[in-house]
Amino acid sequence: MSVSNSASPSSLSYRDAGVDIEAGDALVDRIKPFAKRTMRPEVLGGIGGFGALFELSKKFKEPVLVSGTDGVGTKLKLAFQLNKHDTVGQDLVAMSVNDILVQGAEPLFFLDYFACGKLDVDTAADVVKGIAHGCELAGCALIGGETAEMPSMYPEGEYDLAGFAVGAVEKADIIDGSKIVPGDVVLGLASSGAHSNGYSLVRKIIEVAKPDLDADFHGRTFRDVVMEPTRIYVKPLLALMQAMPGVVKGMAHITGGGITENVPRILRDELTARIDAASWTLPPLFQWLQQAGNVDTQEMYRVFNCGIGMAVVVAADVADAVAAQLTAAGETVYRIGRIDSRKDGEAQTIVA
């Protein structure tokens, strides 16, 4: 196909098309120190290769790799609205590492994907700094990632995130809920806030109620409370499993679907979990959301974590010792329920 000279533009560059290679290079330079702090001895090489290399430790005898991927959901919309980008990186890490943790896996490494229409180096650096902090909290290496600048794909000032975590567990130590029996106890570990789920409803309630986001809310601004990053439970629970091998029968990361839809994921069909809603106090953020949005109580437990970010199932005779160990590690622990035999037609998790 020929092009007439009169129609030929002056020499075009990638920058003319909306992609700034120099900005990408500047971002890599900014984030290298953050990533370096997360490195583990098993990491071979550094950032910048076509693939990231990780040598599985010889401490594993019969390792099983466990992988997870997730995003941050519409909590990002609030981050854009509030111009607050320093916490969503931790959210991204937490969603994946907490998921693989529940099967007994130690998170080993993490990769991120950051996509935008126009790369803002400061914003992206804030996000990746949060990702690196989350990796430090989880003890895993930020081993690589991808920054995709795609003109016209995203509105100005917006971006999307995806995270990928890989961990390992000894085959004999996989936690799958198969050992849970009637009489077992459900312990609840406190959440830090709404974590990264239910934010479509959070945003709708904020839109309707129009709160002052900078007003005092129990000693903090409302914006800081609603953007509080997801708690990462990895180190306390791995320490528990090492100190008391075999005591954890099942764990449920309370994410999308809330308590009522996540606890059943670790229960056999013939079991049900009876959760006592009076065993912990609904945190102020959830009280406000329920009141401001006139949200039905059961809907609250189906959408939000309602103050419980991780459920841990153990035998009744070790429940106090497990709770004490987790409390000593800095967790707030509640005895929130028990496991019973399931009756015909009964839900697998009942919050009452």
UniProtKB/Swiss-Prot annotation:
It is found in: Cytoplasm. GO terms for biological process: 'de novo' IMP biosynthetic process; adenine biosynthetic process. One of its GO terms (cellular component) is cytosol. GO terms for molecular function: ATP binding; phosphoribosylamine-glycine ligase activity; phosphoribosylformylglycinamidine cyclo-ligase activity. Gene3D superfamilies: PurM-like C-terminal domain, PurM-like, N-terminal domain. Keywords: ATP-binding, Cytoplasm, Ligase, Nucleotide-binding, Purine biosynthesis. The keyword ATP-binding applies. It is an enzyme of class 6 (ligase). Its EC number is 6.3.3.1. InterPro entries: PurM-like_C_dom, PurM-like_C_sf, PurM-like_N, PurM-like_N_sf, PurM_cligase. It holds the Pfam family AIRS_C. PANTHER family: TRIFUNCTIONAL PURINE BIOSYNTHETIC PROTEIN ADENOSINE-3, TRIFUNCTIONAL PURINE BIOSYNTHETIC PROTEIN ADENOSINE-3-RELATED. HAMAP family: AIRS. This is Phosphoribosylformylglycinamidine cyclo-ligase. The lineage of its organism: Bacteria, Pseudomonadati, Pseudomonadota, Betaproteobacteria, Rhodocyclales. The gene is purM.
